[in-house]
């Protein structure tokens, strides 16, 4: 898990630097814990990997006051987990779904677990 954490941290910091992200911006995560483990997408979902990735990103992004949005899988129509505060700020429509590891994906499930006040929105625009 330490290797995954280090790779996530490195990638996040590089993206933030190149994008010139600032406080209040939204960093969107989409991906597959199965692929991180070297398997076909959706075939070996890992809650442990999902939690490690999300917790690592939150550690970095919260310090910079950047929101994390986490895309779910096709089972929840690729809806995005965000903090309620962001959904209200930007007037995103909240949908009624709670991600699960095999119906939403491990990243969205971890986000729903670790966010302060998580909600799920249909899409982000802007």
Residue ranges and their predicted role:
Residues 6, 32, 62-65, 77:
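Detector for Asparagine
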Residues 64-126:
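Ligand-binding beta-strand-loop-alpha-helix segment within the catalytic cores
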Residues 29-34, 71:
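Glycine-rich beta-strand-to-loop/alpha-helix junction loops that act as flexible
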Residues 1-27, 43-60:
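N-terminal glycine-/serine-/threonine-rich phosphate-binding loop
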Residues 37:
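Glycine/Thr-rich phosphate-binding loops of Rossmann-like dinucleotide-binding domains
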Residues 19, 32-34, 43-46, 96, ...:
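Generic serine detector
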């Amino acid at each position: 898990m330490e290797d995954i954490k280090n790779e996530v941290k490195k990638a996040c910091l590089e993206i933030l630097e190149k994008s010139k992200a600032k406080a209040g911006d939204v960093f969107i995560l989409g991906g597959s814990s199965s692929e991180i483990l070297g398997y076909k997408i959706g075939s070996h979902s890992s809650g442990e990997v999902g939690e490690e990735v999300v917790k690592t990103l939150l550690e970095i992004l919260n310090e910079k006051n950047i929101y994390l949005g986490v895309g779910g899988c096709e089972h929840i129509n690729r809806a995005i987990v965000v903090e309620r505060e962001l959904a209200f700020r930007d007037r995103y429509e909240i949908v009624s779904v709670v991600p699960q590891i095999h119906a939403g994906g491990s990243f969205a499930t971890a986000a729903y677990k670790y966010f302060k006040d998580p909600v799920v929105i249909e899409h982000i625009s802007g």
